[in-house]
């Protein structure tokens, strides 16, 4: 049993020792602004600042960083638990922050601590912003640190530091003493309220004696007066907010009971001395106002008029405890390796950065940031045919996103710049359909087509697609032709359209019984009696990082057979166009199909009287915006391609 307890204690000690301070953190950009129109140090203020952790790779759960702030009376957060959580955009709780020490009237410094709620070692850096409410300690008692701070603060512009890394110039207003009594009060953070009253004022002379009665709970809010905390002294040395910088003892008779304090002083106070009282009261939960009722009766000697006069008055002072504010935002950059395997035996390894941002609690603050991403992808596809296609692509683009998190409206605009380099070696697949004869006894030419497509164009320094083609056939009447058309377009600024035009040459061949003497008429065989079909499928697949553009094709087909993306000498012209329009996407599969389909004449037993070879010029136009462009085939040809590719791959 003793050994078991030793193990428990050892594990507990180990857990405490494993939590380390995060020292590689910097604080900057401090802004201190007033919460109210009253710009005195002991009133409410808002502090906002940035923090940055340059190397987050060693941060584990339980690690923490602390900001120590002298001259700060207390920090006040929004919720009742007095904690603030800073989360990332993916929902990960990065830090939970709390006030580990309120200086109040007890300590020299107020400390603010943030503890890591999760293992954050997967992030390279963490940057964020923190906002909370505070008030400064500028005196009001005989407590050691409050008395020191009464001498520190001055009215007017003043450089105020929070910690040892950041500071801000704050313009403090002085306090006016226009009545017979001056009041001040603030909550301590320890379930109590500290109040200060200054009175027994005798202008043009000195104080002869009198009484002062204070009810610290005139509204019956169950506020208890801490009689042991009562301080009754005199002073004529005050700072700009009428708090004593030094004080003198008195022989006052002090009676404390319940929420009441009675003070009787039968001695003279010279040279502008006045009587001040400091006391602590309990602060019940959910109590936001505290009312003090004061009664004064005292006698003064006017040395100028050489007269003695009595002053008697009563007043009520209401203290309102303001609600605290806090706001926390954070962004992180992560680095990790991901591996993906597809049915094409493709392995993609990418090292890249992701960015996130979030807004926690309440407040209204906008944070703009730029996150740079670098992506490198290397893909090697196992060859399945003899025709090679090499595609090199480099793309640079930017995207925008807005995120709003928390109870207040908080928008963070994020600009992400991505640089991606893709190098691929892809093989094509050739599928040859068997030759068959139906309803035709004459001579027949069999066409076997092989199509090689490679392409290159430039959009904003981004290589994309143009075309070339090689056609081979056993028919000596058709000449082997290699056509290559490349169009380059220089980079243009973002949000300006870029147009890339490429020309694809195609062959439409017709089997007909057209007579040479009558070029304007011909007859054709029924489409149902096809002779042969030879198809070549070239499939290239790549994954660019840019959003894609959809391409749709308008084509005019003849009634006989059609060669798509093939070239030869021809006597006629026909055309179809492809137009690219902007759309969103992250992957594009490009399929090019060439087909040769022969149909016989309707005359039984006749020979093909001639071949009409129809040259088709294909115009491809790609419209890009903000540097985003790629190709995706759709419409009728796209549907055929998709079915063919699905059949081959699956």
Swiss-Prot record:
Q: What is the effect of changing residue 211 to I?
A: Little effect on secreted alpha-agglutinin activity
Question: Which UniProt keywords are given for this protein, alphabetically ordered?
Answer: Cell adhesion, Cell wall, Disulfide bond, Glycoprotein, GPI-anchor, Lipoprotein, Membrane, Repeat, Secreted, Signal
> What's any GO biological process attached to this entry?
agglutination involved in conjugation with cellular fusion
Q: At which residues is glycosylation annotated?
A: 79, 109, 135, 248, 282, 289, 299, 303, 306-308, 311, 314-316, 329, 331, 334-335, 338-342, 345-346, 349-350, 364, 402, 485, 501, 614
Recall the GO molecular function terms of this protein's record. Answer: cell adhesion molecule binding
The answer to whether UniProt assigns keyword Nucleotidyltransferase to this entry is no
Q: Which residues form the propeptide?
A: 628-650
Q: List the SUPFAM superfamilies hit by this protein, alphabetically.
A: Bacterial adhesins
Topology in membrane: Lipid-anchor; GPI-anchor
What are the start and end residues of every segment in region (Ig-like fold domain important for alpha-agglutinin activity, contributing to a functional binding site for a-agglutinin)?
A: 216-322
Which residues belong to the signal peptide in this entry? Answer: 1-19
Q: Which cysteines are joined by disulfide bonds?
A: 97-114, 202-300
Q: How does it assemble?
A: Interacts with AGA2.
Which protein are we looking at?
Answer: Alpha-agglutinin
Q: Which organism is it from?
A: Saccharomyces cerevisiae (strain ATCC 204508 / S288c) (Baker's yeast)
Q: Which gene encodes it?
A: SAG1
């Amino acid at each position: 049993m003793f050994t078991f307890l030793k193990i428990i204690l050892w594990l507990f000690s180990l857990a405490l020792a494993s939590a380390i301070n995060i020292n590689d953190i910097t604080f900057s950009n401090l802004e201190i602004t007033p919460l109210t129109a009253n710009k005195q140090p002991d009133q409410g203020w808002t502090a906002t600042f940035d923090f940055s952790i340059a190397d987050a790779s060693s941060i584990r759960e339980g690690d923490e960083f602390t900001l120590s702030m002298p001259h700060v009376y207390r920090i006040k957060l929004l919720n009742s638990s007095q904690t603030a959580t800073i989360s990332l955009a993916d929902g990960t709780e990065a830090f939970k922050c709390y006030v580990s020490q309120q200086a109040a009237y007890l300590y020299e410094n107020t400390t603010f601590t943030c503890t890591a709620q999760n293992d954050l070692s997967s992030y390279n850096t963490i940057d964020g912003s923190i906002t909370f409410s505070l008030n400064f300690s500028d005196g009001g008692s005989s407590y050691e640190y409050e008395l020191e701070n009464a001498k520190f603060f001055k009215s007017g512009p003043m450089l105020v530091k929070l910690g040892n890394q950041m500071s801000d110039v704050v313009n403090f207003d002085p306090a006016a003493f226009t009545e017979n009594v001056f009041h001040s009060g603030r909550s301590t953070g320890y379930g109590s309220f500290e109040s200060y009253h200054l009175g027994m004022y005798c202008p043009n002379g000195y104080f002869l004696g009198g009484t002062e009665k204070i009810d610290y709970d005139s509204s019956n809010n169950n506020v208890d007066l801490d009689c042991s905390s009562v301080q009754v002294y005199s002073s004529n040395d005050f700072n700009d907010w009428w708090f004593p910088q030094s004080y003198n003892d008195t022989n006052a008779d002090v009676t404390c009971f319940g929420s009441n304090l009675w003070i009787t002083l039968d001695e003279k106070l010279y040279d502008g001395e006045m009587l001040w009282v400091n006391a602590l009261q309990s602060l019940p939960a959910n109590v936001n106002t505290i009312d003090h009722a004061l009664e004064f009766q005292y006698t003064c000697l006017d040395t100028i008029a050489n007269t003695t006069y009595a002053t008697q008055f009563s007043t009520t002072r209401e203290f309102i405890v303001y609600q605290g504010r806090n706001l926390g935002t954070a962004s992180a950059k992560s680095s990790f390796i991901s591996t993906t395997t597809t049915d094409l035996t493709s392995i993609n390894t990418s090292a890249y950065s992701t960015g996130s941002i979030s807004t926690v609690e309440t407040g209204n603050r906008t944070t703009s940031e730029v996150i740079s991403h670098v992506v490198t992808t290397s893909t090697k596809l196992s060859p399945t045919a003899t025709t090679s296609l090499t595609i090199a692509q480099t793309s640079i683009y930017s995207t925008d996103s807005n995120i709003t998190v928390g109870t207040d409206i908080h928008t963070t605009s994020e600009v992400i710049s991505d640089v991606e380099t893709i190098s691929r070696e892809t093989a094509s697949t050739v599928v040859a359909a068997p030759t068959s004869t139906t309803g035709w006894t004459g001579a027949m030419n069999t066409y076997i087509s092989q199509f090689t497509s490679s392409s290159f164009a430039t959009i904003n320094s981004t290589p994309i697609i143009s075309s070339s083609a090689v056609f081979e056939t056993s028919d000596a009447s058709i000449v082997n032709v290699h056509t290559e058309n490349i169009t380059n377009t220089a980079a243009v600024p973002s949000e300006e359209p870029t147009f890339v035009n490429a020309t694809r040459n195609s062959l439409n061949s017709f089997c007909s019984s057209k007579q040479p003497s009558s070029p304007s008429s011909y007859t054709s065989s029924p489409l149902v009696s096809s002779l042969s079909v030879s198809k070549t499928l070239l499939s290239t697949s790549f994954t660019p990082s840019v959003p894609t553009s959809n391409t749709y094709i308008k084509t005019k087909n003849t009634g006989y057979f059609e060669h798509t993306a093939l070239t030869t000498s021809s006597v006629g012209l026909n055309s179809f166009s492809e137009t690219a329009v902007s759309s969103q996407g992250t992957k594009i599969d490009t399929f090019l199909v060439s087909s040769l389909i022969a149909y016989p004449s309707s005359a039984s037993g006749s020979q093909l009287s001639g071949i009409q070879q129809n040259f088709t010029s294909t115009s491809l136009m790609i419209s890009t915006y903000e540097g985003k462009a790629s190709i995706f085939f759709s419409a009728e040809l796209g549907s055929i391609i998709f079915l063919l590719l699905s059949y081959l791959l699956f």
